[in-house]
Amino acid sequence: MPFTLGQRWISDTESELGLGTVVALDARMVTLLFPAIGENRLYSRNDSPITRVMFNPGDTITSHEGWQLHVDKVNEENGLLSYTGTRLDTQEANVTLREVLLDSKLVFSKPQDRLFAGQIDRMDRFALRYRARKFQSEQYRMPWSGLRGQRTSLIPHQLHIAHDVGRRHAPRVLLADEVGLGKTIEAGMILHQQLLSGAAERVLIVVPETLQHQWLVEMLRRFNLRFSLFDDERYAEAQHDAYNPFETEQLVICSLDFVRRSKQRLEHLCDAEWDLMVVDEAHHLVWSEEAPSREYQAIEQLAERVPGILLLTATPEQLGMESHFARLRLLDPNRFHDFEQFVEEQQNYRPVADAVALLLAGNKLSDSELNTLGDLIGEQDIEPLLQAANSDREDAQAARQELISMLMDRHGTSRVLFRNTRNGVKGFPKRELHTIRLPLPTQYQTAIKVSGIMGARKTAEERARDMLYPEQIYQEFEGDTGTWWNFDPRVEWLMGYLTSHRSQKVLVICAKAATALQLEQVLREREGIRAAVFHEGMSIIERDRAAAWFAEEDTGAQVLLCSEIGSEGRNFQFASNLVMFDLPFNPDLLEQRIGRLDRIGQAHDIQIHVPYLEKTAQSVLVRWYHEGLDAFEHTCPTGRTVYDSVHDELINYLAAPESIDGFDDLIKSCRQQHDALKAQLEQGRDRLLEIHSNGGEKAQALAESIEEQDDDTSLIAFSMNLFDIVGINQDDRGENLIVLTPSDHMLVPDFPGLPEDGCTITFERDVALSREDAQFITWEHPLIRNGLDLILSGDTGSSTISLLKNKALPVGTLLLELIYVVEAQAPKQLQLNRFLPATPVRMLLDKNGNNLAAQVEFESFNRQLSAVNRHTGSKLVNAVQQDVHAILQQGEAQIAKAAQGLIDAARNEADEKLTAELSRLEALKAVNPNIRDDELAAIESNRQQVMDALAQAGWRLDALRLIVVTHQ
């Protein structure tokens, strides 16, 4: 095409330069000025990587003054174009805009504009864009969206609770599972779902001070949620950045003590507009009607302002009725306002529980039992169901399940309280105790005597704590020259045990970090035993590396030496041998130690080894834990209660372990108290609530569906394709591990979620569970979600040209592959993606407007095509521009009809589901006061907004590919 001064051109290779203007010409060269950046570029007149910018009728263009023109007509005179049409800001008709006056910052965003402007993408990017659209749309439609991305085992009861609660509007619930059943994971799964769907954006987690780091690590490692820890120092720093320091972060963890200590801080927290608050160890919030504690009042203030609340607490039976009521009162003070009334109500639910027990037993029901069931579900005609349930027909079991479901909906606290017990959940291992009695070395005997004389003024509790760790007493006297490990028989025993069990992984826990470090040195130097260390002085990354080394099967560490605090929140269930080098001071810590291995999903019975020194506090405590509480071989929900009741007596025995007269009687009375409490707890179990919390067959089916999704290889293929195109290096390390590192030629300089020094990833859930240094890649992982956003939010792959070598078709035959997107714009919290995610509609049109997409599948067709370089592609486009316009018009006529069909289907689905949920809850509210008015109002409002948003849904062209047939 001949050049003329004033013409507008665009660079094929540097589209960010904007529109260029021809400002100089000679026989061989042309100079373009790019006003957007104020630079000139010199190009050859022949075969340069630049494309003439020509708009068409129907386009909207912008002048250099900023006003826009809808083009009706294009005129060419002396090689220069002028556009005539309607000015959009004044609606003035027949306005003419010369091309030299076009806005130089013009960006071509529509796929067809990019194609005509010569901005042609690589073919593989077009394919990636379509796959990204397709996969993203499919994932949003999955019923378990938000439940697959966490690094956890697929445990049915956890998935059931998260699925139920995570989909509610501003859920306010109490999670009261027994220890080891994963309350933290349930809370994390609910958070993950709510954040992913947009139902929540700001989250506050309030925990005891000792658990802050555990939660921080757990949220990051398991759910890829980056929380910020607020303490005094961080709070003071943030005050420089904002009036309310808590508004500087979306996801915050802080301690209960931090919340309680300052009135101003509590006010700032209350004003920070959180969507969801999690309170861990909520049973420590002390309440009575006359005198609620300051901690309780602080959380109560927050609970009045925060819409969604998750309280994590011990089981109701452990707490006692009044304490349990206090937790429920935080969730819904209008519903739970009178303790006496609450007690009476709970007693009234006994017939409901008895009725469920009858149905579960499967025996024939008597007339009186049938009448009881009829009375309990009185507002509905259930006669046919009762008859079916009491018959020998095939549908008898289904009828019983339906009746149980109806009873549970009507049960007092089943919507606000979830509680699972080990008895009701399968999959726990046995625990076997091996005690190893060892002689007390003379060096320790001497140190203990001297310590007794010098520490005469110490309290009994201080002496008891000292006596538990004789190596510390010895070291204090000997200083740096003390080498307790040379004579301590526990060290000899440990070395012997490890060398005779070299093929087994062993977790060793001791109270102090110094002990763990000294043991590592001894094991390494004396026996060459590979030992990793894990303590509170290490950073999270260092702990991850130690845990990963321990997890490696062949070349990894045989033993992991943990301090008490350092092991909080970490689970090592791939190991089943636990050595307690010393014993913790209270039963809760003992259970926490065993809980590192005793998790649901543990494949082997747990072997607990306790080497202890005779005539020391250790020998007293090992007997009290085992004989008095049965705390080694079974979980001990009574431990804290019994410990508190005999605290002073027990401390005296620990402080003076050589005087144990009467200790047998103490053990006997503790065991009696333990057995009585345990029987009481068992009797108080609410089996109806357990059935509801457990989820039954539905929960099992949910776990199986997600497991099936885990086995789908399409994610791996898509991810590798994405990483290739983005420019991320991939190094296969074997064992289903891949190392990703940034390259020098990335699509963007910093890929969100990819650290500068790279990261290790795996697509296997089992590998991710044993290798905490490896990120678990699912469709919900930030790397994939950020990758999808990167591709789909920009114009990557939105216009391309390919050649189709096919001798059955005439040379020069044109096909246009169009990817339309049908979507609705609405706030994220409406969760429109449940009904109408951005849905791609593919068309493959020939010159006559025939759509061949149904006959020609995308992937197989894509493999038959070959790429065209950008310069040749621009020439091809210019040659067939009018034909492409004609095909596009035919595509628009066809997509309008197809889009309306999708929109109507989405509206019908939304109306059906949301109306059914609202009707169900309104009907139940008549018999179950735990259904909140604000929840019903929110569902009604949400339904109306969803229907309105779907009515406004539309379509747009997202990508196109021009295909030209060749025989070469």
From Swiss-Prot:
SUPFAM superfamilies: P-loop containing nucleoside triphosphate hydrolases. GO terms for molecular function: ATP binding; DNA binding; helicase activity; hydrolase activity, acting on acid anhydrides. GO terms for biological process: regulation of DNA-templated transcription. SMART domains: DEXDc (SM00487), HELICc (SM00490). Keywords: Activator, ATP-binding, DNA-binding, Helicase, Hydrolase, Nucleotide-binding, Transcription, Transcription regulation. A motif (DEAH box) lies at residues 280-283. Residues 490-644 form the Helicase C-terminal domain. The keyword ATP-binding applies. ATP binds at residues 177-184. Pfam families: Helicase_C, RapA_C, SNF2-rel_dom, Tudor_1_RapA, Tudor_RapA. Transcription regulator that activates transcription by stimulating RNA polymerase (RNAP) recycling in case of stress conditions such as supercoiled DNA or high salt concentrations. Probably acts by releasing the RNAP, when it is trapped or immobilized on tightly supercoiled DNA. Does not activate transcription on linear DNA. Probably not involved in DNA repair. Interacts with the RNAP. Has a higher affinity for the core RNAP than for the holoenzyme. Its ATPase activity is stimulated by binding to RNAP. Belongs to the SNF2/RAD54 helicase family. RapA subfamily. This is RNA polymerase-associated protein RapA. The lineage of its organism: Bacteria, Pseudomonadati, Pseudomonadota, Gammaproteobacteria, Enterobacterales. The gene is rapA.
